[in-house]
Amino acid sequence: LAVDGRQRVYVATGGKGRVYRLEKDGSSPKTVFESAAANVTAISVDDRGELLVGTDSPGRLYRVPPDGRAFALLDGPYTQVQAIRPAGNGATWVLAVSPGGAAPSAAAPPAAAPATAPTPQVSTEVPIVAIGDSTTVTPATSGHATGTTSAPRGAVYRLDADGLVDTYWEATGELPFDITVAADGRILVAADNGVVYALEGDPVRMARIAQVPARQLTRIIPRGDRYLL
């Protein structure tokens, strides 16, 4: 679900990749986005009613102007667009993943992705952790140390206000499930094995800032100076 500045509600659906808009007056829902994708997996809307829509099978990102025609901004190697998070500087951060395994090669057809996100195993809170001496900071290209080099399982993309998309970070370790933009501009990533990463800088630096006793962290939600996982 997403709500625009006029308090209209946008509903993403599975089975058929559609987005419906519900007006405040209770009139019949209007289809504002329709595609051949299996599911709409992420949506974001600004105050003007412009939509960003993420899908799976295939994993694409679309822009839908108010009462306009959808066009694709991103058609990458991952099977699912998992999260869309606007930032205060006009940029938008997009998380794309391949839940079933490594991202396919450019020559391979898109792999099928699960229609629903995995069920989280724990609900807890962790404070914001500043990057410092107690935090493990590694180059973004190294990922999580596993003893072998693995193909990326997901990526964070940066969408500029003018529509340009570039790859900011690729996940070669834990599978990422969600992202959020911290007040200081860092991108926080909730991932497999109860791990939370922070991404900052350009070129990007990755810091492992927290770990909780959970198999998966499927959401990270800001609550003041803390986060609900």
Indicate residue ranges for each PLM-predicted region.
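Short loop/turn segments immediately following the C-termini of beta-strands
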Residues: G14, D56, V97-P99, D192, ...
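Short loop/turn segments that connect beta-strands within beta-propeller blades
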Residues: L22-S27, V64-R69, L159-L164, E200-V204
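Surface loop/turn motifs at the tips and blade-to-blade linkers of beta-strand repeat domains
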Residues: V32-A36, L73-P77, Y168-T172, I209-P213
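Conserved beta-strand position repeated once per blade in WD40 beta-propeller domains
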Residues: T41-A42, Q82-A83, F177-D178, R219
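Conserved beta-propeller blade signature
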Residues: R8-V11, E50-V53, A91-L95, T167, ...
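Short, conserved, GDST-rich strand-edge loop motifs in beta-rich repeat architectures
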Residues: V97-A151
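A short loop-to-beta-strand structural motif that recurs across blades of beta-propeller domains
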Residues: G17-R21, G59-R63, G147-Y157, V195-Y197
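Residue-level detector of Asp-centered blade-edge/turn motifs that repeat once per structural unit
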Residues: V3-R6, V45-R48, P86-G90, V181-G185, ...
